[in-house]
Regions:
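Anionic-ligand binding patches
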Residues: 2-5, 9-199
Length: 199
């Protein structure tokens, strides 16, 4: 079984990755480690930045053995907001303390007659800890859908309670995790990762 450093402190992401990658032992990014850079214009750029930053820090300071680093950059892309918040999803409305408040602000940005189509995108970057242990690569997943009129449900995290996946009348915040994990952007990216690794 591979031991993998997850380059994130996001508890929601860690829970999802534990469900979606049961063949791996995940080590979360430690509290004493620095924030990882996210200065790219695209999800792939940010995922690679985080993977390389985490790999370099772990080689110098890591306290346990890991085989590889896994970094995620993901976000919500709303057509009526020209693809926003996109790569800025994690930093959107940071002056507000709760996901519910941030979701309300996002919904308030939409004109009443705007199209509500949106998609969740996830890019994963894989970096073996040692250069001799294989290639670095990225995989991605996306799920199409639309924005609900209001915050609905308490499952998941982030924008889940306002996102209606295509073909469903429940948000990710209302759907059971077992259902979400069959169709979410992160589930699809993890499936691509497992395929690439030959699992």
């Amino acid at each position: 079984m591979l031991t993998v450093l997850l380059a994130s402190r996001n508890a929601g992401k860690l829970r999802e990755f534990e469900d979606l990658l049961p063949g791996m032992t995940l080590v979360s990014w430690p509290a004493e480690a620095p924030e990882l850079p996210e200065t790219g214009a695209f999800f792939q750029d940010n995922a690679l930045q985080k993977a390389e930053g985490a790999r370099a820090w772990w080689l110098a300071h890591g306290t346990e053995s890991v085989d590889a680093v896994l970094a995620d950059d993901s976000g919500l892309c709303v057509d009526a907001l020209w693809g926003g918040p996109g790569v800025l999803s994690a930093r959107f409305a940071q002056d507000l303390s709760s996901y519910a408040e941030r979701n309300r602000r996002l919904l308030d940005l939409l004109p009443t007659d705007a199209t509500r189509t949106a998609r969740f995108v996830c890019v994963l970057a894989w970096a073996p800890l040692l250069d001799t242990a294989g290639e670095r690569f990225t995989v991605s997943g996306a799920v199409e859908g639309s924005l609900a009129l209001e915050h609905r449900g308490s499952q998941g995290f982030g924008y889940d309670p306002i996102f209606l996946p295509e073909g469903f009348d429940q948000t990710f915040g209302e759907l059971p995790a077992a259902v979400k994990h069959t169709l979410s952007h992160r589930a699809r990216a993890c499936a691509a990762l497992r395929a690439k690794l030959g699992e």
